[in-house]
UniProtKB/Swiss-Prot annotation:
One Gene Ontology biological process: translation
Residue spans of biased composition, Basic residues class: 1-18
Domain of life: Bacteria
Protein name as annotated: Large ribosomal subunit protein bL32
Gene Ontology cellular component list: large ribosomal subunit
Lineage start: Bacteria, Pseudomonadati, Rhodothermota, Rhodothermia, Rhodothermales
């Protein structure tokens, strides 16, 4: 198994690791069929609690305010 001959500096390591977050795409949003608010795809709506036409969670008052 290969072993590094010299240690990589902290800045070199951090530069390599930082590129991962630049390549991530923002989550895709869609309109909720029940209330019309934007929601993340394949997740229950935070505002009304519906997913695929059914009430799956109770909406909390904190998110609406």
């Amino acid at each position: 198994m290969a072993v590094p001959k010299r240690r990589h500096s902290k800045s070199r390591t951090r530069k390599r690791r930082s590129t991962y977050y630049n390549e991530l795409e923002p989550p895709q949003l869609m309109e909720c069929n029940n209330c019309g608010n934007p929601k993340v795809m394949h997740r229950a709506c935070k505002h009304c609690g519906h997913y695929r036409g059914r009430q799956v969670i109770e909406p909390s008052d904190e998110l609406i305010a």
